[in-house]
């Protein structure tokens, strides 16, 4: 999907999935956490939380473990799912994609969610579309159920 000028995208996501991403980010802090929310192909609805391993084990960089990523992507394909959300945390900065994050963004249909855990008492969660190096922030609508 190509983003058209003037198109507004919104991430609609269940609260339990937000809580799962934040818990994963807190658990892995001070290292960056990363993972995927899978959903039925064509639905744009995240349904299943898949926490993944940060192969870098770093507070300033993340990289999905390539072997684990291959297994997860194959399992999603077998289940007719796609990566609706690809997320990771920033441990000392705001929830905004770095230049490296933008370079690593290879799924044009995914919502890229960043969770900042720099404040131990609250989190910051923001969502973006990243296509061909262009970063567009989108609203996040947290719901109890779809």
Curated annotation (Swiss-Prot):
It is an enzyme of class 3 (hydrolase). The keyword Amino-acid biosynthesis applies. It comes from Mycobacterium tuberculosis (strain ATCC 25618 / H37Rv). It comes from the Bacteria. Induction: Up-regulated under oxidative stress conditions. Disruption phenotype: Strains lacking this gene are shown to be attenuated in macrophages. It catalyses: [CysO sulfur-carrier protein]-Gly-NH-CH2-C(O)-S-L-Cys + H2O = [CysO sulfur-carrier protein]-C-terminal Gly-Gly + L-cysteine + H(+). One of its GO terms (biological process) is proteolysis. Signal peptide: none annotated. This is CysO-cysteine peptidase. Pfam families: Prok-JAB. Belongs to the peptidase M67A family. Protease that hydrolyzes the covalent CysO-cysteine adduct synthesized by CysM to release L-cysteine and regenerate CysO. PROSITE patterns: MPN. Inhibited by EDTA in vitro. A motif (JAMM motif) lies at residues 88-101. Zn(2+) binds at residues 88, 90, 101. Residues 11-134 form the MPN domain. GO terms for molecular function: metalloexopeptidase activity; zinc ion binding. Its EC number is 3.13.1.6. GO terms for cellular component: cytosol. The keyword Hydrolase applies. Its cofactor is Zn(2+). Pathway: Amino-acid biosynthesis; L-cysteine biosynthesis. SUPFAM superfamilies: JAB1/MPN domain. Keywords: Amino-acid biosynthesis, Cysteine biosynthesis, Hydrolase, Metal-binding, Metalloprotease, Protease, Zinc.
């Amino acid at each position: 999907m190509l983003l058209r000028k003037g198109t507004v995208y919104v991430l609609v996501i269940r609260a339990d999935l937000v809580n799962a991403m934040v818990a994963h980010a807190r658990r892995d802090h001070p290292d960056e956490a990363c993972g995927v929310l899978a959903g039925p192909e064509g639905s744009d609805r995240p349904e299943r939380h898949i926490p993944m391993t940060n192969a870098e084990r770093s507070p300033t960089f993340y990289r999905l473990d390539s072997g684990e990523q291959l297994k997860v992507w194959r399992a999603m394909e077998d289940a007719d799912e796609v990566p609706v959300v690809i997320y990771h945390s920033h441990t000392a900065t705001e929830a905004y994609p770095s230049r490296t994050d933008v370079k690593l963004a290879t799924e044009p249909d995914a919502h890229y969610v960043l969770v900042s855990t720099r404040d131990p008492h609250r989190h910051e969660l923001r969502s973006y579309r990243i296509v061909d190096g262009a970063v567009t922030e989108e609203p996040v609508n947290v719901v109890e159920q779809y």
